[in-house]
Amino acid sequence: MGSKTLPAPVPIHPSLQLTNYSFLQAFNGLPVPAEHVPNLYGFSALHAVHLHQWTLGYPTLHLPRSSFSKVPGVSSLVDSRFQIPTFPLFPHMIHPKQESPNLSNKTKPRFDFANLAVAATQEDHCKLGLMNDQGSPPAMGGLLDVTKLTPEKKPTRGRLPSKTKKEFVCKFCGRHFTKSYNLLIHERTHTDERPYTCDICHKAFRRQDHLRDHRYIHSKEKPFKCQECGKGFCQSRTLAVHKTLHTQVKELKPSKIKC
C-alpha cells in the first residue's frame, strides 16, 4: 500500500493542553457560562480568544473596545476590573456574510493611468457595439450620441455668448438681410413692384419715404436746405449728394494754392 499524506494537524498553543481544545469548540459562537471559564488550567478568557483567532487562522479584524463586550456570551467572560485592549476578534460571529476590509482592498483593481488613451478608445468601441436586436441603439444612448455630435459653442472669455441673428435670404439672387423689411424692399427691385403712387402725377415708388419726398416737388416746399450755400432740396438724399460737392471743392482749393 502506498503511503498517503495526512492532513496537517491543527496548530495548538503550547500552553494549552489537548483537554482544553473542547473549550475552544464550545466557545465558537456559543455563550459559555462564566463559572466554566475563569482560571481553567490557568487560562484566562482573553487568552482563549487570542488563541481561537490564531488556531483557526481567521484574518484580523480590529474593533473598538466597546464592541467586544457586546458580543453574545462574551460579556459574562470578561472581568470588569481590567480594561479590554483592542485586539482582533473572530469575524464569522460578527459579520458572517461580509469579507474583511483588507481582503476587499487587495482584490480591488487599480486604474492604469499609463494606458488611459487606449482605455478611452476601447470604451467608445464598446458603446458603439451596444445595439438592440433591431439594429437601433438604445433610447438613452441615442440621446447621448446626438448631444455629442452637435457642435458646442463655447463663450468667449469675459463676454456673454451673442445671440444668433436671423438671416433673410432673397429667393432671386441669394442676398442675405438681417431684417425682413429690407428683404421686402430688395425683392421689389426684381419684381418691379411700386405700391406707393403719387396722387398728383401718378408716379409710383417702391418705398413710402420716396413718395413723401416726391410730394415736396408739387408743393414747391424744400425743407432740406444746405447750410453753406442756402440751397433748398425736396429730398434728404439729394441734399447729401449736394454736400459732397462742397467737400470736394474744399479739398481742391489747397492743392491749387500749393502749385
Curated annotation (Swiss-Prot):
Keyword terms: Developmental protein, Metal-binding, Nucleus, Repeat, Repressor, Transcription, Transcription regulation, Zinc, Zinc-finger
Protein location: Nucleus
Origin superkingdom: Eukaryota
InterPro entries named among the record's database cross-references: C2H2-ZF_Transcription_Reg (IPR050717), Znf_C2H2_sf (IPR036236), Znf_C2H2_type (IPR013087)
GO molecular function list: DNA-binding transcription factor activity, RNA polymerase II-specific; RNA polymerase II transcription regulatory region sequence-specific DNA binding; zinc ion binding
One GO term of the biological process aspect: negative regulation of transcription by RNA polymerase II
Tissues where this protein is expressed: At early gastrula stage, expressed in the involuting mesoderm and endoderm. During neurulation, expressed in the pronephric primordium, following expression of osr2. During tailbud (stage 35), expressed in the rectal diverticulum and in the kidney ducts.
Pfam families xref list: zf-C2H2
SUPFAM superfamilies in the record: beta-beta-alpha zinc fingers
Zinc fingers (C2H2-type) by residue: 168-190, 196-218, 224-246
UniProt GO cellular component terms: nucleus
Entry-linked PANTHER family: ODD-SKIPPED - RELATED (PTHR14196), PROTEIN ODD-SKIPPED-RELATED 1 (PTHR14196:SF5)
Function (record text): Transcriptional repressor. Required for pronephric kidney development.
Family indicated by similarity: Belongs to the Odd C2H2-type zinc-finger protein family.
The protein's name in its UniProt record: Protein odd-skipped-related 1
Source organism (scientific name): Xenopus laevis
Lineage: Eukaryota, Metazoa, Chordata, Craniata, Vertebrata
